[in-house]
Amino acid sequence: YVYTTRQLVTLMNNEAELAGVMWHEVGHVAARHAQRRQQTQQQNTLLGAAGAILSGILLGDSQLGSTLGRAALQGSQLLTLSFSRSQEEQADQLGVRYLSQAGYDPMAMSTVLESLARQSALDAQLQGRDNANLPEWASTHPDPASRVRDAATMAAGLPGTTLNRD
């Protein structure tokens, strides 16, 4: 299934932005991201566990052995995060292309991502969090400003001008 939330729908200004979100999600399905992410996560977890076990065998129960074991496990998690970011970028690219092919304005992906980024920043501010300081390598999604810019660049020159069909 492909779905969205009411909260996300309230951020949308037109039908093309809704189509952009839906096409982004269809892009995840078409590229089999869920299956690939699960496989990658399993492989990375096994790799991290092997590194932790190996450091325990070679270095014993020393402080260095414990530190290297934790680093191996955390490193495997960071590899999975990087994979998730690349999947989001690919889904954005597919969403822009599908928007254009359906006759919608492909810039709608950029504008809805911009609205989402502004709302996320506002939510963080209202909750007393400084979301801007979260480094990209620690996130499952690419930097919001980069996503907006990349989507606009991808959309430039593509056909499609419809914002609302009715």
For the regions a language model picked out, list residue spans one by one.
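Catalytic Zn2+-binding segment of zinc metalloproteases
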Residues: 16, 26-43
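Membrane-active amphipathic alpha-helices enriched in small hydrophobic residues
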Residues: 43-61, 67-79
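Acidic/histidine metal-binding catalytic segments
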Residues: 38-47, 64-68, 103-113
